[in-house]
Amino acid sequence: MNVFNQKMKLAAKCILLTLFLVCFTGIAQHKKAKFKVIAFYTGKNDQAHISFVHEANKWFPKIAEENHFEYDSTSNWDNLNAKFLANYQVVLFLDTRPETPAQREAFQKHMENGGGFIGFHFSAFALNDSSYPQNWDWYHNTFLGSGEYGSNTWRPTSAVLRVENQDPITKNIPKTFKSQPNEWYRWSNDLTKNPDIKILLAIDESSFPLGTGPKAHEIWHSGYYPVVWTNKKYKMMYVNMGHNDIDYEGKTNKTLSYTFENETQNKVILNALLLFGTKKGK
């Protein structure tokens, strides 16, 4: 009888230990998020930008789970207000920019109060006499520093990118690496002359000629083109990537390339997210 009781007690202890381990593992797996990210997008215009938005809204939740932060996204730009933004540490613009005065004021205050930001590709676009005129001087000239859109390459092609400055964002990034295909932008402002701008990645000369045309101005043969940079006065980064290659010629609108299928490129974005999400102050 004593032997039976001892076995029952041992079995009970094993069950309790198993339950404890299961509970502990569950708690560890669902530990509190380090920070929260909100992505704004429109997703209605260029199919290349729509494709990128869909891809981003699949990739970011995956890396959020792996790195213990939360990711939300919205196409309602009216959510760009102080009350809503108070729930998040980092804001992303996946394709366009805010257009109303209230939205713009809320975003500027978010940044001036130490919030984080990553903008992709078309989010910096501004061109007078277009649907996105340069009518927000703080954003395009002070914050991004780029000014107006100047020109772009065509069609989307890969480039060799070069690290221009050491930074926590470029930590463990090779000096040069090949990017995913992209439509590359040139800007009206010379970012090298802006003391607030820190250029992180630029197109390496080995990339030239860059683009395939058919128009001559869509092929770059020389020049200096920054593609990723920060503004030292804010927790921000602009990334020129964000235009997937699309089968326009075949009229299928099929996605031919994906921005987030590049580990090195992804590492730059993840480094920035983790830095902006956890760093206190500006």
Task: Describe each PLM feature range.
Residues 54, 58, 101, 105, ...:
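A structural signal for well-ordered alpha-helical segments within the folded catalytic domains
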Residues 30-35, 59-62, 66, 209, ...:
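Extracellular ligand-binding/catalytic regions of CAZymes and related secreted enzymes
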Residues 97-172:
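A glycine-rich, often tryptophan-bearing local segment used as a flexible ligand/cofactor-contacting loop or short
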Residues 130, 181, 248-251:
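A short, polar/proline- and glycine-enriched secondary-structure boundary/capping micro-motif
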Residues 44-45, 79, 98, 124-126, ...:
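Short, solvent-exposed loop/turn segments at secondary-structure junctions
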Residues 34-127:
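Helical hinge/lid and interdomain linker segments adjacent to catalytic or ligand-binding clefts
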Residues 152-238:
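Catalytic beta-strand/loop cores that center a nucleophilic Ser/Cys/Thr
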Residues 1-32:
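Bacterial Sec-dependent N-terminal signal peptides
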